[in-house]
């Protein structure tokens, strides 16, 4: 039982996933710091407030606690867009470049798909069954 658990944990996918989660958490901290300490102060210089949280806040009814906070939504949306852009330009673009260089080195052309081995095997089985009948 312990051997099976050890084999499961040491599989490449589980280890890769664990590394990705740790690196993702660290990267999230870096991007959050970028947004909170660099980008939002720049926006505060333009808008006049450190975030949009209080910019478009509308009270609904007579209860002061009942507010529609459009500015808070815009702040979160802006944070999301900045984080997505940072991930795209700092992770996706370099990885695509590395993959393209590796494919060029191996002689794999862009758009050229290698067939799935399972599909190839199933095609061979189908052809063998056709030739029998």
Swiss-Prot record:
InterPro entries: Mechanosensitive_channel_CS, MS_channel, MSC/AndL, MscL_channel. GO terms for molecular function: mechanosensitive monoatomic ion channel activity. It holds the Pfam family MscL. It is found in: Cell membrane. Disulfide bonds: none annotated. GO terms for cellular component: plasma membrane. Keywords: Cell membrane, Ion channel, Ion transport, Membrane, Transmembrane, Transmembrane helix, Transport. It comes from the Bacteria. It is a multi-pass membrane protein. Its main location: membrane. The chain crosses the membrane at residues 14-34, 73-93. Gene3D superfamilies: Large-conductance mechanosensitive channel, MscL, domain 1 (1.10.1200.120). Channel that opens in response to stretch forces in the membrane lipid bilayer. May participate in the regulation of osmotic pressure changes within the cell. Belongs to the MscL family. Homopentamer. This is Large-conductance mechanosensitive channel. The gene is mscL.
């Amino acid at each position: 039982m312990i051997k099976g658990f050890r084999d499961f944990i040491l599989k490449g996918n589980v280890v890769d996933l664990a590394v990705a989660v740790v690196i993702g958490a660290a990267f999230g901290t870096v991007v959050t710091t970028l947004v909170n300490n660099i980008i939002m102060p720049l926006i505060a210089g333009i808008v006049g407030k450190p975030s949009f949280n209080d910019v478009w806040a509308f009270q609904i009814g007579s209860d002061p606690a009942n507010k529609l906070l459009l500015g808070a939504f815009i702040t979160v949306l802006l944070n999301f867009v900045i984080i997505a852009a940072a991930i795209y330009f700092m992770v996706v673009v370099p990885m695509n470049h590395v993959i393209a260089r590796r494919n060029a080195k191996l002689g794999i052309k862009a758009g050229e798909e290698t067939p799935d081995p399972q599909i190839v095997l199933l095609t061979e089985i189908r052809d063998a069954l056709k030739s029998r009948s």
